[in-house]
Each structure stands twice: as C-alpha cells, then as structure tokens.
Amino acid sequence: MDWWTKRPDNEPRSIRGRYSRPAVSEITDDLLVGEYPRLSDLDWLKQEYRVSAIHNLQDDIDLHINGLDEAELRNECGRLGITFVRTPIHDGSADDMAARLEHALQDLDGLMDGEKRVFLHCNGGLNRAPTVAIGWLHANRDMSLEEAMHYFKQRRPCGPFMTVLEGHFGSRDQKPAK
C-alpha cells in the first residue's frame, strides 16, 4: 500500500519499518529510552542491551496503530524473564501526561529500585518517555529539571513536556527536596 491510499480504520499503521529495530539510547547504566519494541525485538533488547524490564507508556490507540497486543507483549516478556509494566499515557496530551505522571514515575521507580536495567518507551521515544525519564532523573539523581533535561538531551533528542514537569515538581532550576 502506498502513502496516499487510505487504509481501513482497523488496519495497523506502524510508524517504523517492518524490519527495523527500535532506536535505543542509554541514559544511565540502568535506564534506556527508545522507540517501541515489537515481539521480535524483545529477545534482541535482552541480548544486545541486557534489558531486564520494559516500561511501556503506549496507550491502547498506540498499540493498535502499531499492530501490538499487550497480552502478547506481556507473555513474551514473561517467557524471556523480562518484567513488563505498562502505564498508558495518551500521545501528545500534556493533560494526560500531567494526570498520569506520578503513576508513571512510581512505576519506573519501582522497576529501578528492583535493580533492573529498564527500557522505557512510548512510540518514538521523543516525548512521553523522555518526560518521565527527566522527571525520574530530577527526583532520584539530585538534578534540577534543567540539569536533567540537558543531561537527557545529550544522550537522546527529544521534546519533553517541561511545563508538565514544572507543574509537578516546581521551578526548572530547583533541586529536588530531600
């Protein structure tokens, strides 16, 4: 099918090429951020990047568009010994990010506390996952939001919801409360 022919509404329209692997960026020794994985990418993530946990921020629409099934992802992760956590956040919605940020941070923190090597992803790894990762860096690595954002952007291009993070944590220049 070409770019101009409308696909049926129920047909998946993956944002990645059929045979390409997800782009992965190492943010810290135990936190990686990137594009969504397919079932066929899970073992590759485990072997190539030593991933032991996946934190998925895709909502149901994202899963459908990309031809993914949560139960299949969860089952394959279980078979491979990878912990799978999903915190769905609607793509492009600052309001949904603000509403779900605390839950996403708690889920990520739980994985990181478990001494896992975590792969955090949304669709493209450009907005939702970076926002959560920057918030986690701020809260757990003694960085201001500004420092956390610059640290992250040195490792991966992104467009995080900084206004959501400021609304949640306070000023960009403020270090986390101890």
Identify the meaning behind each predicted range.
Residues 1-19, 178:
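Non-catalytic regulatory/accessory regions that flank a structured catalytic core
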Residues 2-3, 43, 135:
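Residues in intrinsically disordered, low-complexity segments of regulatory proteins
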Residues 6, 12-15, 85, 127, ...:
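Short, intrinsically disordered low-complexity segments
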Residues 20-22, 27-117, 139-169:
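Cysteine-based protein phosphatase catalytic domain of the PTP/DSP
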Residues 115-134:
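A phosphate-binding catalytic loop at a beta-strand-loop-alpha-helix junction
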Residues 160, 177-178:
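Residue-level signal for secondary-structure boundary elements
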Residues 168-177:
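The feature captures the conserved acid-bearing segment of alpha/beta-hydrolase catalytic domains
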